[in-house]
Amino acid sequence: MDLALKVKILKMLCKYLTNKNNISLFFNILTNIPNGDDYMFECVQHFIQMKNSNECDINDLFLKLKSQLLVWQDSSFEQFLKIEKEEDNFLESPLEVAEGAIKCKCGSERVFSFSKQTRSGDESTSVFALCSSCKSKWVL
């Protein structure tokens, strides 16, 4: 990390922290994070947002920084992490496609179908179908 970057971070911290020990501790933790400069700036910005909204407990913040649980791993991002995990799971195990389980109105039995949960958990799954002969699509 170059000197200009260190000075910029120190200025940002001095603006929001009054205790010199906290500034020093916060700066030392930040400059030793192995995730790079972008992550460090995200941490500082997240801290400033927490400080401005009066949600900041400095001890909690130090613990999160030390364990690198700030920014994306922070509890304020739980819903986004859940969506990201669902997308990752879909990419790791894509939908299974069945052939011949449904008959098309054109008479062909070469229909590809798959099930997907599109409504709430207590509703049944939706079945999407595509006829390979007439290219007709429908949802059951």
Curated annotation (Swiss-Prot):
A Gene Ontology BP annotation from the UniProt entry: DNA-templated transcription
Disulfide bridge positions per record: none
Record GO terms (molecular function): nucleic acid binding; zinc ion binding
Residues holding Zn(2+): 104, 106, 131, 134
InterPro entries from the UniProt entry: Znf_TFIIS
Zinc fingers, TFIIS-type class: 100-139
Keywords: Metal-binding, Zinc, Zinc-finger
A Pfam family annotated for this UniProt entry: Zn_ribbon_TFIIS
Family: Belongs to the IIV-6 349L family.
UniProt name for this protein: Putative transcription elongation factor S-II-like protein 349L
